[in-house]
Amino acid sequence: MSIKGRVFKYGDNVDTDVIIPARYLNTSNHKELASHCMEDIDKDFVNNVKDGDIIVANKNFGCGSSREHAPIAIKASGISCVIASTFARIFYRNSINIGLPILECDEAVKNINDGDELEVDFSTGIIKNLSKNEKYKGEAFPEFMQKIIDNDGLIGYIRNK
């Protein structure tokens, strides 16, 4: 599976409270969550994000509270994947469980700029920066995790098994 998209770049320690602020946790409606995604760190995000776009961030993306709402808000906003130097472990697992592809690749994060166009191949872990004509090697998903992503998350995977 591969995707193409434009980059929204963020720094270190982007926590779940800025991905989807706690004041919106009274809903599980995906569209409602998407309409508030990243608003405490990037007020223009929801107006500028397009289906297929990609979030790139430094270390410890998704730290903070263990809330499934954070990856749901990101995915529902149209983001096709998140690339970071490192992820908080619970965010990593929640993302896989809801079918949001994520990759760790420090080299890519260091070289990618906001607005760059990327192509990401999850089967190989190759990230192509189409804006700079560069390639970076991230960690490919193990086969079982790729199957979960391909089935739009853990529930879809179990249904189709």
Swiss-Prot record:
Catalysed conversion reaction: (2R,3S)-3-isopropylmalate = (2S)-2-isopropylmalate
Gene3D superfamilies: Aconitase, domain 4 (3.20.19.10)
Protein origin, superkingdom: Bacteria
Gene Ontology molecular function terms on file: 3-isopropylmalate dehydratase activity
Pathway assigned in UniProt: Amino-acid biosynthesis; L-leucine biosynthesis; L-leucine from 3-methyl-2-oxobutanoate: step 2/4
Complex formation: Heterodimer of LeuC and LeuD.
Xref: PANTHER family: 3-ISOPROPYLMALATE DEHYDRATASE SMALL SUBUNIT 1 (PTHR43345:SF2), 3-ISOPROPYLMALATE DEHYDRATASE SMALL SUBUNIT 2-RELATED-RELATED (PTHR43345)
Name of the protein in its database record: 3-isopropylmalate dehydratase small subunit
